[in-house]
Swiss-Prot record:
It comes from Acidovorax ebreus (strain TPSY). The keyword Glycosyltransferase does not apply. This is Proline--tRNA ligase. Keywords: Aminoacyl-tRNA synthetase, ATP-binding, Cytoplasm, Ligase, Nucleotide-binding, Protein biosynthesis. GO terms for biological process: prolyl-tRNA aminoacylation. It holds the Pfam family tRNA-synt_2b. Catalyzes the attachment of proline to tRNA(Pro) in a two-step reaction: proline is first activated by ATP to form Pro-AMP and then transferred to the acceptor end of tRNA(Pro). As ProRS can inadvertently accommodate and process non-cognate amino acids such as alanine and cysteine, to avoid such errors it has two additional distinct editing activities against alanine. One activity is designated as 'pretransfer' editing and involves the tRNA(Pro)-independent hydrolysis of activated Ala-AMP.
């Protein structure tokens, strides 16, 4: 490709709404152009990156035995109503009507459609296992799209779906896909971690995320440096402190704390560690009738250490809260505690509540909590003496660095990551909901055991940039660079020697199968170099009259601070050697 034929459009400054580095550089390098909130044009330079991502994904999916198909972007609502996701997904699922008033959705994933295919086409155990995948446009109506392609509304995703006759087969298919994902991300040349994850709205009971390590990542990744343990923050288990609960030493005392409504404020006032305070979080669950009207509500009190944060995913697994919960209203809090938020605690309640205690709080002694009296807290609170031993103890919090690893191999560490892939073992969640069966070896109908496997094709380039950039621009890994080599002839329009050498090297690289672009635009050297450093092509060959007279050209890798002089006769071999490194 010659630059004069290509579409190159770079910016000196990033748009004001571009918050993270990848968004800024993708806009400045002309990879994407914003069309609307969370919706982007993939410009020619950016599309080349996306196509290279797709090619690697496709190769490894095919190698793993998956078969490509394409499912519609617009899908009948009836299928989504069968599984209940039409209502459960909420506003993220874009719903539309056709001219006849029929309901449709714009696909965010395709579990329903692929399960419908399976129940029609896969009739016997002899046809199993099967794995269908697509690389297709998706849409999720994100409430706050941001960070460019990192969290857009329209995006390209590779989604695969496996169908097996039993759990053993399904889990084997899951492992095949997980290994394929490792090969994919290894080929991209990215630093990543595979972490245990919660299955969320997709469902299932076995799940891993593939997280590209980046300081700007939205997700917290928990891992143990001394072992292979890794999980996302939602999933990582917080173990109870080792050892027995200390004996009570302090008397129960109501202490004035005027204007101190947070644990941090109280700890500072009383000159005690924040870890000796306990925060009270008040939730409510509702029972509704057939019309959706609330019949009765139950108020719950959760106790966590003052220096810990509640993990909503874990809370949602507590029996009684697993059908859904909300934060209690101010009126409900006043009715049960006789006090406004900021001074709440488990003692001196106006009405009974259901109490759930975090593991750490269950082994605390002489702790501090609200007195259910404005401007007051209670110190020296102890289980068994001042309160009955808690009936419901659960892991309710996010882990913190230094916590014990659940595998017992050391302490936990935390870093940031960008989720670029996710694999799920679904079991029969969707096949049962849609009555998707096959005839088993015993001649009886059986539900498909399923798995689903996603890769964010358009998120991957953004994640790669977050991990590979400097003050001058992007530094693409070779595997997904828009072009692998750029030839920069200085004064090509004025020097026949420069032009001839540039054209000759260009032809040689093309013949060798190298993805090369020749910059024949006639730009000034500074502007030409700035463009390609911004765009991030990893290998650059500069040809100028002065170096040619010495029988040399200059080679520079995008990560190198300076260029290396290479003989004209050796440059082709030198580039090939660097590409193979």
């Amino acid at each position: 490709m010659k630059a004069s034929q290509f579409f190159i459009s770079t910016l000196k400054e990033a748009p004001a709404d571009a918050e993270v580095v990848s968004h800024q550089l993708m806009m400045r390098a002309g990879l994407i152009k914003k069309l609307g909130a969370g919706i982007y044009n993939y410009m020619p330079m950016g599309l080349r990156v996306i196509r290279k991502v797709e090619a690697i994904v496709r190769e490894e999916m095919n190698r793993a035995g998956a078969v490509e198909c394409t499912m519609p972007v617009v899908q009948p609502a009836e299928l989504w109503q069968e599984t209940g996701r039409f209502d459960k997904m909420g506003p993220e699922l874009l719903r539309i009507h056709d001219r006849h008033g029929r309901d449709f959705v714009i696909q965010p994933t395709s579990e329903e459609v692929v399960t419908d295919i399976a129940r029609q086409e896969l009739r016997s155990y002899k046809q199993l296992p099967k794995n269908l995948y697509q690389i297709q446009t998706k849409f999720r109506d994100e409430r706050r799209p941001r960070f460019g392609l990192m969290r857009g509304r329209e995006f390209i995703m590779k989604d695969a779906y496996s169908f097996d006759r039993d759990q053993a087969g399904a889990k084997a298919s899951y492992q095949v896909m997980a290994q394929a994902y490792r090969r994919i991300f290894d080929r991209f040349g990215l630093r990543y971690r595979a972490v245990a994850a919660d299955s969320g709205a997709i469902g299932g009971d076995l799940s891993e995320e593939f997280q590209v390590i980046a300081a700007t990542g939205e997700d917290a990744i928990v891992y143990c440096p001394a072992s292979d343990y890794a999980a996302n923050m939602e999933k990582a288990e917080a173990l109870a402190p080792a050892g027995a609960r200390p004996a009570a030493k302090q008397p129960l005392t109501v202490t004035p704390t005027p204007g101190k409504s947070t644990c941090a404020d109280v700890a500072e006032l009383l000159s005690v560690p924040l870890s000796t305070t306990v925060k009270s979080l008040v939730l409510a669950t509702d029972e509704t009738d057939a019309a959706g009207e609330i019949i009765r509500s139950q108020v719950w009190l959760l106790l966590l250490r003052g220096d810990h944060d509640m993990n909503e995913i874990k809370v949602a697994k507590v029996p009684g809260l697993d059908a859904g919960f909300r934060f209690a209203t101010v009126a409900e809090i006043a009715d049960h505690f006789g006090c406004k938020p900021g001074y709440l605690g488990p003692l001196n309640l106006q009405k009974p509540v259901k109490l759930v205690v975090d593991r750490d709080v269950a082994v605390m002694a002489d702790w501090i909590c609200g007195a259910n009296q404005e401007g007051h807290h209670i110190t020296g609170v102890n289980w068994g003496r001042d309160l009955p031993e808690p009936d419901m103890v659960a892991d309710l919090r996010n882990v913190v660095a230094g916590d014990l690893s659940p595998d017992g191999q050391g302490e936990l560490a935390i870093e940031r990551g960008i989720e670029v892939g996710h694999v799920f073992y679904l079991g029969t969640k969707y096949s049962k909901a849609m009555n998707a069966t096959f005839l088993g070896e015993d001649g009886k109908p059986a539900f498909f055991e399923m798995g689903c496997y996603g890769i964010g094709v358009t998120r991957l380039p953004a994640a790669a940039i977050e991990q590979n950039h400097d003050e001058r621009g992007i530094i693409w890994p070779d595997a997904i660079a828009p072009f692998t080599v750029v030839i920069c002839p200085v004064g090509m329009d004025r020097s026949e020697a420069v032009k001839a050498q540039a054209e000759s090297l260009y032809a040689d690289l093309l013949a060798a199968g190298v993805d090369v672009i020749l910059d024949d635009r006639g730009e000034r050297p500074g502007a030409m170099f700035a463009d390609w450093e911004l765009i991030g092509v990893p290998h650059r060959v500069t040809i100028g009259d002065k170096s040619l007279k010495e029988g040399q050209v200059e080679y520079q890798h995008r990560r190198d601070a300076s260029a290396t002089k290479v003989g004209v006769a050796d440059i082709l071999a030198h580039v090939k050697e660097r590409l193979a490194a």
